[in-house]
A protein has these predicted regions:
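PRPP-associated nucleotide enzymes
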Residues: 1-259
Length: 259
């Protein structure tokens, strides 16, 4: 929109000064250990973004390709959960040779459901947000590609939606590892007891979401997809290992308003 040319990101603690003499860059803090949010490439960022110097669509497509290598399945169509599952589904389809079909149509006037405050609003949001294309699903073995599973309730409703539209089988593929820990760095994720992967086995999650099979991308494949060769990303939501000391008790008190 502004007809700009991408040069680089503004680094943490850096100040970019644009003046008559040109552009100068200064660091006003001591450089520390970098811990970029890996979930930006999985879910948050638009696919046409360049985040931490890496194209998001390219990262997500590679996640899908590696997901197909790690967890192949015999199927008739690959269907994304739009929008954040689209690039990964394209990669999965390209790697597996299974045709890609846009069989879930998204209403773009509905926001992201996993951060809504109540389950009732999240459930209603799924109905408003997605509509299946029956003739693309009926009688088909479907690989359903999504970016993540948080509570599992949204995934279950989408699996049911695809099955009710006539799908013969629904195989759920997730383009990141299981989310087992909350984020304490500004993302309003649920508490750990609400995260389905923190409290259930893979088979229990599969049964809950009512899929014929379920598989997640591995940690190594995620790192490869976002080209994290120097350990500069945060994976705390998948590992529980935070890059800084986290006072969990104080955060819980602050969120609940207790003293």
């Amino acid at each position: 929109l502004i007809n700009a040319t991408y040069v680089s990101d503004v680094e943490p603690g850096e100040m970019v000064i644009v003046g008559p003499e040109g552009i100068t860059r200064e660091h006003y803090t001591t450089p520390g250990v970098t811990a970029h949010c890996s979930f930006e490439h999985v879910y948050f960022s638009r696919p046409d973004s360049i985040v931490f110097g890496k194209p998001v669509a390219e990262s997500r497509e590679q996640m899908g390709r590696l997901l197909a290598r790690e967890h192949p399945v015999e199927a008739d169509v690959v269907v994304p959960v739009p929008d954040s599952g689209v690039s990964a589904a394209i990669g999965y389809a390209a790697e597996s040779g299974i045709p890609y079909r846009q069989a879930l149509i998204r209403n773009h006037y509905v926001g992201r459901t996993f951060i809504e405050p109540s389950q009732a609003i999240r459930d209603f949001g799924v109905k408003l947000k997605l509509n299946p294309v029956r003739h693309l699903l009926e009688g088909k073995r479907v690989v359903l590609v999504d970016d993540s599973i948080v509570r599992g309730t949204t995934s279950r409703k989408i699996v049911r939606m695809v099955r009710n539209a006539g799908a013969r089988e629904v195989h759920l593929r997730i383009s990141c590892p299981p989310t087992i820990s909350p984020c304490y760095y500004g993302v309003d994720t649920p508490s750990q007891n609400e995260l389905i992967a923190a409290n259930n086995s893979l088979e229990q999650i599969r049964e809950f979401v009512e899929a014929d099979s379920l598989a997640y991308l591995s940690h190594d494949a995620l790192r490869d997809s976002i080209k994290d060769t120097n350990g500069q990303f945060c994976y705390a939501c998948y590992t529980g290992k935070y890059p800084t000391l986290v006072q969990i008790g104080e955060i819980v008190l602050a969120k609940t308003g207790c003293c």
